Amino acid sequence: MAKLHDYYKDEVVKKLMTEFNYNSVMQVPRVEKITLNMGVGEAIADKKLLDNAAADLTAISGQKPLITKARKSVAGFKIRQGYPIGCKVTLRGERMWEFFERLITIAVPRIRDFRGLSAKSFDGRGNYSMGVREQIIFPEIDYDKVDRVRGLDITITTTAKSDEEGRALLAAFDFPFRK
């Protein structure tokens, strides 16, 4: 079992129960899933780019990504409905906790000019979204084999009812928010 999951069950639950005066352990917010999304708009011209992006996402997450397709045709972007334009992975359970631990301890501190993550990136329902400009911050990606530096979106979905609860949950994991 991931260390962070044990830490959540042993420490974070108790801390949040006293902070928010919950009556039941089931009221305490928890991390439900983590979604990684990589938009590869250039895949319209070169299909190999999408394969490389999917390979990067597989290395980062340890799970085969789902190829996302365009929902509707947009003439300005020269895309048609059904064109493959990105890939995404939804992590739950053990893989989610392992990724979350690697994200906090290894990947985020490797971001160039890192001063902390914005605490304003909550969606109003306790879910946190962040963008990463370079996939090479993850140690699973071999810098020499990267054909192009790509960014990805990371969404942490929680069961929190408000941004305040979500922020408290992530802060309990020592999430590096900007002061």
Curated annotation (Swiss-Prot):
Record carries keyword rRNA-binding:
yes
Q: What does this protein do?
A: This is one of the proteins that bind and probably mediate the attachment of the 5S RNA into the large ribosomal subunit, where it forms part of the central protuberance. In the 70S ribosome it contacts protein S13 of the 30S subunit (bridge B1b), connecting the 2 subunits; this bridge is implicated in subunit movement. Contacts the P site tRNA; the 5S rRNA and some of its associated proteins might help stabilize positioning of ribosome-bound tRNAs.
Q: How is the quaternary structure described? A: Part of the 50S ribosomal subunit; part of the 5S rRNA/L5/L18/L25 subcomplex. Contacts the 5S rRNA and the P site tRNA. Forms a bridge to the 30S subunit in the 70S ribosome.
Can you name this protein? Large ribosomal subunit protein uL5
**Would you name any one GO CC term?**
ribonucleoprotein complex
GO annotation terms (biological process): translation
The cross-references to SUPFAM superfamilies, in alphabetical order and at most eight, read: RL5-like
User: Which GO molecular function annotations are given, in alphabetical order?
Assistant: rRNA binding; structural constituent of ribosome; tRNA binding
- The species is Salmonella arizonae (strain ATCC BAA-731 / CDC346-86 / RSK2980)
Q: Which Gene3D superfamilies does this one have?
A: 3.30.1440.10
Q: Which HAMAP family match?
A: Ribosomal_uL5_B
Q: Which InterPro entries match?
A: Ribosomal_uL5 (IPR002132), Ribosomal_uL5_bac-type (IPR020930), Ribosomal_uL5_C (IPR031309), Ribosomal_uL5_CS (IPR020929), Ribosomal_uL5_dom_sf (IPR022803), Ribosomal_uL5_N (IPR031310)
The entry assigns this protein to a family as follows: Belongs to the universal ribosomal protein uL5 family.
- Record-linked NCBIfam families: PRK00010.1
